[in-house]
């Protein structure tokens, strides 16, 4: 049996743009994607802490060190510039893969600059 757990998240980032005319997705600073281990076009769940919206889209890279977090297409209607977002990916794991597993959490400042990458070793999954 496989279980679905949090794989990684970019925590409390700031929405910097909304482009309703783009085909879809969320643009994320390439450095943040890399540090979180999120691949281009990977499915992500986005939670808008300002309005409670939760939605699924896919990630595309924005220029490295740009601080860009931009909602595109229809998702652009689900936030306004300055809203704080949590961007998450999930993975499927077997019991064997879960031994000593913990998610990756990317912490950023208000301009979406990388502050730290955390591994919650004190919250290891016990199987």
UniProtKB/Swiss-Prot annotation:
Gene Ontology terms, cellular component aspect? cytosol
What family does the database annotate?
A: Belongs to the PanD family.
Q: In which pathway does it act?
A: Cofactor biosynthesis; (R)-pantothenate biosynthesis; beta-alanine from L-aspartate: step 1/1
Physiological role: Catalyzes the pyruvoyl-dependent decarboxylation of aspartate to produce beta-alanine.
What keywords are assigned to this protein?
A: Autocatalytic cleavage, Cytoplasm, Decarboxylase, Lyase, Pantothenate biosynthesis, Pyruvate, Schiff base, Zymogen
Q: Which residues bind substrate?
A: 57, 73-75
- Primary enzyme class: lyase
Q: Which residues form a coiled coil?
A: none
Q: Which reaction does it catalyse?
A: L-aspartate + H(+) = beta-alanine + CO2
Q: Where in the cell is it found?
A: Cytoplasm
Its principal location? cytoplasm
| GO biological process entries | alanine biosynthetic process; pantothenate biosynthetic process
Tell me how the protein is altered or processed after translation. Answer: Is synthesized initially as an inactive proenzyme, which is activated by self-cleavage at a specific serine bond to produce a beta-subunit with a hydroxyl group at its C-terminus and an alpha-subunit with a pyruvoyl group at its N-terminus.
Q: Name the needed cofactors.
A: pyruvate
Q: In the Enzyme Commission scheme, what number(s) does this protein have?
A: 4.1.1.11
Q: Which domain of life is it from?
A: Bacteria
Name-wise, this protein is: Aspartate 1-decarboxylase
What does the note under cofactor report? Binds 1 pyruvoyl group covalently per subunit.
Q: Which organism does this record belong to?
A: Nostoc punctiforme (strain ATCC 29133 / PCC 73102)
Under the heading Pfam families, the entry gives: Asp_decarbox (PF02261)
On assembly, the entry states: Heterooctamer of four alpha and four beta subunits.
Taxonomy, top ranks, is: Bacteria, Bacillati, Cyanobacteriota, Cyanophyceae, Nostocales
Q: What are the recorded GO MF terms, alphabetically?
A: aspartate 1-decarboxylase activity
Active-site positions on this chain: 25 (schiff-base intermediate with substrate), 58 (proton donor)
In-chain residues carrying the UniProt-annotated modification Pyruvic acid (Ser): 25
